[in-house]
């Protein structure tokens, strides 16, 4: 079948819930809705986590893969059965959960919060290796007069690899000053960039 998958935030409930809707291109099929499990580390990420308050969601074959920027666990939902599973994916090097932000409205505090906590990025499937990868950055001290550009490039950066069943294989600390912190991540076919 052909369908579109999209993530939505349901604000009609408290705390807000996240869902994935599968919209079929065939007219006679109803929309399917899959409820994402809340973060096991913090069931309500809508309050106190600044810019880390929504899940990272990806799709692979018949699965929804997601995680939360504030914590290290991974989650998977089977699109055929609707059943979900959580996977422990702790870092060996960093804290596995972000602390709450001190302010709900002060953007300076939001920036500080973003630097002084780990941030877990989305889980990506690497088809040529039949495995998964997740990147995350560690917390770093944030001074009031710091150059944010330099500070963002000096954070410790980690790659965590998982087999095709989401079992952790290895975690590697990557060199600092070798990545752009202001972009989304993606995998490339053979591991080489074409310029």
Where do the PLM segments sit?
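Structural signature of eukaryotic scaffold interfaces centered on beta-propeller domains
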Residues: 1, 48-60, 115-129, 184-192
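Surface-exposed loop and turn segments in beta-propeller and other repeat-based domains
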Residues: 30-51, 85-115, 172-180
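Conserved beta-strand positions in repeat-built beta-propeller and related beta-rich domains
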Residues: 6-8, 66-69, 135-136
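Beta-propeller blade signature
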Residues: 15-29, 72-77, 148-167
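Short glycine/acidic-enriched loop and turn motifs that connect beta-strands
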Residues: 10-15, 71-73, 139-143
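Loop/turn-rich, solvent-exposed surfaces of beta-rich toroidal or solenoidal domains
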Residues: 114-164, 168
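Asp-box/WD-like beta-propeller blade repeats and closely related beta-sheet repeat scaffolds
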Residues: 1-16, 39
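Conserved small/polar residues in nucleotide/adenosyl-binding loops
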Residues: 195
């Amino acid at each position: 079948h052909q369908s579109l998958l999209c993530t939505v935030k349901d604000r009609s409930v408290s705390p807000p819930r996240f869902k994935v809707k599968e919209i079929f291109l065939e007219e006679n099929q109803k929309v399917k809705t899959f409820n994402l499990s809340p973060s096991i580390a913090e069931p309500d990420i809508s309050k106190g986590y600044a810019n880390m308050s929504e899940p990272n969601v990806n799709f692979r074959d018949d699965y929804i893969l997601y995680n939360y920027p504030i914590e290290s666990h991974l989650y998977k939902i089977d699109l055929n059965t609707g059943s979900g599973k959580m996977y422990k994916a702790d870092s060996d090097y960093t804290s596995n959960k972000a602390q709450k932000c001190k302010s709900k409205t002060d953007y300076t505090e939001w920036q500080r919060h973003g630097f002084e906590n780990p941030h877990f990025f989305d889980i990506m499937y690497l088809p040529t290796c039949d495995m998964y990868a997740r990147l995350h950055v560690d917390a770093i001290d944030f001074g009031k007069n710091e150059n944010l550009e330099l500070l963002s490039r000096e954070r410790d950066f980690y790659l965590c690899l998982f087999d095709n069943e989401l079992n952790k294989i290895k975690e590697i600390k990557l060199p600092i000053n070798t990545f752009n912190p202001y972009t989304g991540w993606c995998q490339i076919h053979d591991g080489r960039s074409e310029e």
